Curated annotation (Swiss-Prot):
HAMAP family: UPF0412 (MF_01372). Keywords: Signal. It comes from Escherichia coli (strain SMS-3-5 / SECEC). Residues 1-23 form the signal peptide. The lineage of its organism: Bacteria, Pseudomonadati, Pseudomonadota, Gammaproteobacteria, Enterobacterales. It comes from the Bacteria. This is UPF0412 protein YaaI.
Length: 134
């Protein structure tokens, strides 16, 4: 009976360690300061081209309004993909995961993510944090 309990406890601890390791796969790709006026050239350039399968957006400071986003891949043709993003993100709010590389070509790496948008309801600039999952 003691060995069954020990085995069960070991499996439970292994499961916890497994899940925490997966949670650490999410990486902050960068933070963008959102101006007060609508801007369509806000770019997050990744210094090292990396495979990113999905992203989350968080309004770290202030509310922001987004009108578009695109992902650019390192490829001979400079391929890109428009993203379906929410139009507003309130301070402290995080979006659901937004899938990229949806054409099943998971070998393309992301070199740049661009955004169009601005800060709303604040005299300070809002900040947009981009979290990636590979």
């Amino acid at each position: 009976m003691k060995s069954v309990f020990t085995l069960s406890a070991s499996l439970a601890i292994s499961l916890l360690l497994c899940c925490t390791a997966q949670a650490n796969d999410h990486k902050i790709l960068g933070v963008i300061a959102m101006p007060r006026n609508e801007t369509n050239d806000l770019a997050l350039k990744l210094p090292v081209c990396r495979i990113v399968k999905r992203i989350q957006l968080t309004a770290d400071h202030g509310d922001l309004q987004l009108s578009g986003a695109s992902v650019y891949f390192k490829a001979a043709r400079s391929a890109s993909q428009s993203l379906n993003i929410p139009s507003e993100i309130k301070e402290g709010q995080t979006t659901d995961w937004i899938n990229i590389n949806s054409d099943n070509d998971n070998k393309r790496c992301v070199s740049k993510i661009t955004f169009s948008g601005h800060t709303v309801n604040s005299s300070d600039m809002a900040t947009l944090k981009i979290i990636g999952d590979d």
